[in-house]
Amino acid sequence: SLYNNGKFKKTKNILDLGTKELRVSFDQMEYAFKQTKIKFKKQNFKTLKKFPKGKRISTKFFWKELGISDYNCSDINKKSKMYIDLNFPLKNKSLMNKFDLVTDFGNNEHVFNVGQAYKNMYQLCKKNGYMWIFQAVYGGNGFFNYDMSFFEGMAAANNLSVLYSCYLVQTS
């Protein structure tokens, strides 16, 4: 895993693009922690025992267990603590080059101006930081679907490296 390979060792802060929640069962979360050899603190995730029903849990608690304590999330909702409309260039220049890790877990396919959305994502990320992108290849619920060549091309055009790339297939 990227965690076991030390990729997040220096990661102190994160920005989730879009408000994110854990959408896995308690058993799946426990298994994921075993894979990374991180102690699973059951009390922090007990709400997941009711998944998919019950209260949802912010990803903030997952990142904290990985040692990333400065959690931030943005949303287009004007009530959001960090309002960012990814369709347009970043207005708040103090956010540029601020985050060690910026995630797109099913957010940027909802933005019409895809090029600007990923440019903003890049600008939010610190030098030598990470952009973690997890997108549906087909179906999904946004305006766009991407394939690997989109992300490989984006990386090549901007002199970035792809650390890990894969397709995940859900069978259940």
Listing of model-derived features with the role each one plays in the protein:
Residues 110-121:
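A short, conserved alpha-helix within the catalytic core of class I
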Residues 142-168:
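Conserved Class I S-adenosyl-L-methionine
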Residues 20-21, 136-140, 168-170:
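Short "lid" loop at the C-terminus of a central beta-strand within the Rossmann-like core
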Residues 104-110:
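Hydrophobic adenine-recognition pocket in adenosine-nucleotide-binding enzymes
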Residues 1-76, 163, 171-172:
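N-terminal accessory regions of S-adenosyl-L-methionine
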Residues 128-137:
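Conserved beta-strand signature within the Rossmann-like core of class I S-adenosyl-L-methionine
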Residues 84-102:
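A short acidic, Gly/Pro-enriched loop at the edge of an enzyme's catalytic core
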